[in-house]
Amino acid sequence: WNKLLQISKVDVGYAPWVLEESKSVFNQRILPLLLDDDSHYRLYGIFLLNQLNGKEILMTEEIWSILESMNDYEKLYLTYLVQGLTLNKLDFIHRGMLKLYEIDYFKNDTSLFIDWIDQAEAVISEKVDLAEVDRYLAAFVYMHYKHTNHAMTKKQIIDSFEVTRYKLDKTIAFILSI
């Protein structure tokens, strides 16, 4: 494969085994989310679809018909991802999911992502400045795991999300108030 990449004068795309893995992830993890009755699960499915290597190859007519049958909010998110529209509210949700996805510890925690979408919508409804997603995400993650077997210390959260203890404490108080 590396030899082919070196001698090829055109972009050969992803390796066959990468595409096969993407197809498997799509069928086992993403498709059930896209078909879920809950809009938050479908949004998360759209997010994961956008993260896949070789997603263009997986976009069959059947998948497009599923995407076309989604509600306007979900289609707006899809348009935001594909065309790069500036949509502050969806951008806030998306930036939070991206940050979670970049951290291996959180990457496969479906309930965390679904709960983030719900929490982000609650934060958005409070009409606060959405520029600093990390502070809201840090407070949310701390609260999310606080009462589980995976509780994280504030120090771990501060290190993972690069926020100050002051901002974390202040944002936890804010989230508890809504």
Task: Name what the model sees in each region.
Residues 18, 33, 37, 128-132:
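Conserved aromatic-histidine-acidic binding/catalytic patches
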Residues 1-4, 10, 102:
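Extended, low-complexity, acidic/proline- and Ser/Thr-rich intrinsically disordered regions
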Residues 6-22, 43-54, 76-85, 143-146:
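Structural detector for internal amphipathic alpha-helices that build alpha-solenoid repeat scaffolds
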Residues 1-2, 23-35, 54-65:
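Amphipathic alpha-helical scaffolding segments comprising HEAT/armadillo-like alpha-solenoid repeats
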Residues 10, 25-26, 135:
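Alpha-helix N-cap/N′ positions at the starts of helices
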Residues 40, 55, 61-129, 133, ...:
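A cyclin-like helical interaction fold
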